[in-house]
Amino acid sequence: MSSEHIQNKLALLPDQPGCYLMKDRQGTIIYVGKAKILKNRVRSYFSGTHDSKTQRLVQEIVDFEYIVTSSNVEALLLEINLIKKHDPRFNIRLKDDKTYPFIKITNERHPRLIITRQVKKDKGKYFGPYPNVYAANEVKRILDRLYPLRKCSTLPNKVCLYYHLGQCLAPCVFDVEASKYKEMQDEIVAFLNGGYKTVKNDLMKKMQEAAENMEFEKAGEFRDQINAIETTMEKQKMTMNDFVDRDVFGYAIDKGWMCVQVFFIRQGKLIERDVSQFPFYNDADEDFLTFIGQFYQKANHIPPQEIYLPNDVDSEAVQAVVPDTKIIVPQRGNKKDLVKLAYKNAKIALNEKFMLLERNEERTVGAVERLGEAMGIPTPSRVEAFDNSNIHGTDPVSAMVTFLDGKPSKNDYRKYKIKTVEGPDDYATMREVIRRRYWRVLKEGLPMPDLILIDGGKGQIDSAKDVLTNELGLDIPVAGLAKDDKHRTSQLLFGDPLEIVPLERNSQEFYLLQRMQDEVHRFAITFHRQLRSKTGFQSILDGIPGVGPGRKKKLLKHFGSMKKLKEASIEEIKEAGVPLNVAEEVHKHITAFNEKAKNTEQK
């Protein structure tokens, strides 16, 4: 769609709140946003300068739609639904839910107490989230001892062990009034909302009474229940003393990114936090609102009794998203400190993100730039490294790995079976591989490397340079990586005549060379082992009547390794798809081979 068409639509935008939907060339909705004034917000995308991520979004926009709403709150609610419906790729994408465990009282005629990670709208009562299953199980274990709800998922025909332990009312056999269940459910709710202290006091009285009546076994049971309550419910440091469930939000922004931290406070305890980081395209407070809206659309994020927000957030809009929750913007005291703490953690997380990015760039792009400077060549953004592998000249192979801006590009890795060289001739092997690789690069117009690294010394380097210059007419820098007596990277050889490039052993550019040399060596060795395994497998099967190339291939595919074939019975060999008489011949041949190998070892 033409730029003129966009400009005409921009001129018609209203001064009202609403949502806008950006579309790409295929008509796919790639971004949904909301605005207090549509005209100002949408026009801002097509005027002025933007950071790189916003520019990427704008470059893909070829059309847009908008929906006018009566208020900013209504726009927020609509935006949440539109994002949920279209899942635009440029919008905030919350990480996959880390599903926390909840304790649930099921909505059944005979309710159960269970632990679940799935929160559904099924009229069950949910308590949590808990930081892990262990914590949830600890609490459930106490509740099971105090409140004898049924344990079986389906009712049996007779009472079970839990009835004899006093932990089930046995509704499978006895009638249990609904009022009894309601009484227990109310007590569980009170217990989990901080009323466990009352329960503990009641148990202490019962323990004393039982002891006075010489009922020591019963007193011991009460004592164990009291200990369980103390160790499970009181071992965490209290953050608030009113047992109210709260979510505390804080966010920080930097370099076009936002980090939101949510503290989950349950029963007065800070039990867990959620951290989300994402690029934002609107005003920070607007995108933060969008985040909250999406956050509580997730099945495992149940709105608590209270939500604490920073000062600059439209609390009225949040209230519309979670109408049954009290929205608070704390101004002072402990509550304000919690919001500040969430902000501080968000800021630290963002700083850490960018520091890690800088460190990663230092060891990749930065290392490549300094390597080029040390060698006196343009920055070698694309490096192709070669290594040969053989054992006494058998099954010779070579391998090439590619690094782009200091990072391995595995799609550009290549393996080579050596075709023209017999015996252990490393120089001839290098000539063949360089010839095959760069003849194809020339023929197919593939990207040329800025630097070729050879795992070897002067002979290998000269062989590679001779092919490049005199056969292919290419002028590509070639350097060699020499190793010490412990097979570790020790020197970079480059120039004409060859000289050692002075590099600090603890520099990032030296570490980069080590990674390249280790990677190409690993790749070559792995390929050589695979080839040896395959050829070794086939050679053992040579000369067996009825086993030609096709059946060798079938046996290799079925068993995967010689070791497994050696251990196979005749019946198992037959299962590979060969006739019984052939399976018997294979088994006989391999048994004889194993015996011969065993006798050789003993001698």
From Swiss-Prot:
GIY-YIG domain residues: 15-92
For this protein, the record's CDD domains field holds:
GIY-YIG_UvrC_Cho (cd10434)
Q: Which GO terms describe its cellular component?
A: cytoplasm; excinuclease repair complex
- Disulfide topology: none
Q: Which SMART domains match?
A: GIYc
Q: Which family does it belong to?
A: Belongs to the UvrC family.
Record note on quaternary structure: Interacts with UvrB in an incision complex.
List the protein's name: UvrABC system protein C
Originating organism: Listeria monocytogenes serovar 1/2a (strain ATCC BAA-679 / EGD-e)
Lineage, broadest ranks: Bacteria, Bacillati, Bacillota, Bacilli, Bacillales
